[in-house]
Amino acid sequence: MVLDKVNNMSNNKQRPIGVFDSGVGGLTNVRALMERLPMENIVYFGDTARVPYGVKSRATIETFTAQIVEFLLQNDVKALVIACNTIAAVAGQKVRAMAGNMPVLDVITAGAEAALATTRTNHIGVMATSTTVNSNAYARAIHSRNPDVRVQSQACPLLVPLVEEGWLDHEVTRLTAREYLKPLLADDIDTLVLGCTHYPLLKPLLKAEAPGITLVDSALTTAEAAAQAALQAAWSPARKAPE
């Protein structure tokens, strides 16, 4: 019996981490995870066939999410990382219900905590998809930790298609981002949460358009949360380090 338990723990440690997003944006999370947990295996699902999610109905997002989670569970993952803000905002509870006791990490929780740790003026801006903004998920997550913080959210529905197109430094993307940033900058924010995993790919452009504003990339904080979960669950490296 003890030997079986030891074998099961060993097998569990060798299983991969499942990461999923509506498209290529979640690869920013994968990169951060690989840097923070270099010995872990990762299974990534990017739903490029049905991107963008941010303009779809709640029911559609929940259906697509259930299909993705089922696929990852069939691949015997040991933890799930919701690398899509829209999914985290709309279907996070569904993911956790399907996962059971499995650790589930999401970018909104990590992003909210990072923003609160970063802001000096308690004026935080959030750029996100329309669905994420309408869900009020970031404001709720931030206010649950500090109700005195002012949160200004801006829907940016055109940015995901531009990133998926590869127009990371295109003039059209620059002009579009500039328009989205105007109300946020007018609100005198000092911290800006990139509330979609596609947006970190635009960091050079956004830094140029919003100088002096600290950008919060939730991919980095999500990776740190995964590392803490790995420590608590005593995950072992899934691969041997190169000699």
Name these PLM-found stretches:
Residues V2-E243:
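Non-catalytic structural scaffold of enzyme domains
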